[in-house]
Curated annotation (Swiss-Prot):
Family per similarity comment: Belongs to the histone H1/H5 family.
Annotated GO CC locations: cell surface; euchromatin; nucleoplasm; nucleosome; nucleus; vesicle
Its job: H1 histones bind to linker DNA between nucleosomes forming the macromolecular structure known as the chromatin fiber. H1 histones are necessary for the condensation of nucleosome chains into higher-order structured fibers. Also acts as a regulator of individual gene transcription through chromatin remodeling.
Name the record gives this protein: Histone H1.1
Main localization, broad class: nucleus
Residue(s) carrying N-acetylserine: 2
Residues found modified as Phosphothreonine: 206
Citrulline sites (modified residues): 57
Modified residues (N6-(beta-hydroxybutyryl)lysine): 37, 55, 67, 88, 93, 109
Lineage, highest ranks first: Eukaryota, Metazoa, Chordata, Craniata, Vertebrata
Residues where Phosphoserine is found: 2, 12, 44, 107
InterPro entries the record matches: H1/H5, Histone_H1/H5_H15, WH-like_DNA-bd_sf, WH_DNA-bd_sf
Basic residues composition-biased segments: 20-38, 150-183, 190-218
Length: 218
């Protein structure tokens, strides 16, 4: 009898399952990392705020600090070790001064020198920003004012040139008129003198008339 070929077994889908498992693990790690990162200010910042808000001259005790942190919504019971580490680091940096006790136990105050140094750079930054903004604004106004002054000065120069032209033209007219009048007056005087001379010449003719009556004798 002839042998019948059996159908090949279907390919198993088992290798795909581990990949899905790996993909599922990655979001779990991301969620854990998101949980580890606390939202809001750090423990040291909360401690500094609590110490600065207190009005006690001798300093704030650890119990008072925990109460202030709990009132701010911080979980004191779970983060007790973090509070102690934050206090030690702040004392080591010099931001806090330990007035009583040793380590994390005792009372703490803000270091005034460090607080003043921290406040000065912020004030200087604000002052420099205001100076830069004012300096950037002033040149624009000055340039506009300078342009306006130049535009105002140019017509003055034009007016001055017009006035100088008018003043230079006006004296020429009387100078041209005066010599003409002076020239006419001597001409009239010269014309009068020869008339008088003609009268003197005609006088001897009247003296010769009696000679005609002399030769008549009876």
């Amino acid at each position: 009898m002839s042998e019948v070929a059996l159908p090949a077994p279907a390919a198993s889908t088992s290798p795909e399952k581990p990949s899905a498992g790996k993909k599922a693990k990655k979001p779990a790690k991301a969620a854990a990392a998101a949980k580890k990162k606390p939202a809001g200010p750090s423990v040291s910042e909360l401690i500094v705020q609590a110490v600065s808000s207190s009005k006690e001259r001798s300093g704030v005790s650890l119990a008072a600090l925990k109460k202030a942190l709990a009132a701010a919504g911080y979980d004191v019971e779970k983060n007790n070790s973090r509070i102690k580490l934050g206090l030690k680091s702040l004392v080591g940096k010099g931001t806090l001064v330990q007035t009583k006790g040793t380590g994390a136990s005792g009372s703490f105050k803000l270091n005034k020198k460090v607080a003043s140094v921290d406040a000065k750079p912020t004030a200087t930054k604000v002052a420099t920003k205001t100076k830069v903004t004012s300096a950037s604004k002033k040149p624009k106004k000055a340039s506009g004012a300078a342009a306006a002054k130049k535009s105002v000065k140019t017509p003055k120069k034009a007016r001055k040139s017009v006035l100088t032209k008018k003043s230079s033209k006006s004296p020429k007219k009387p100078k041209a008129v005066k010599p003409k009048k002076v020239a006419k007056s001597p001409a009239k005087a010269k014309a009068v003198k020869p008339k008088g001379a003609k009268v003197k010449v005609t006088k001897p003719k009247t003296a010769a008339k009696p000679k005609k009556a002399a030769p008549k004798k009876k």
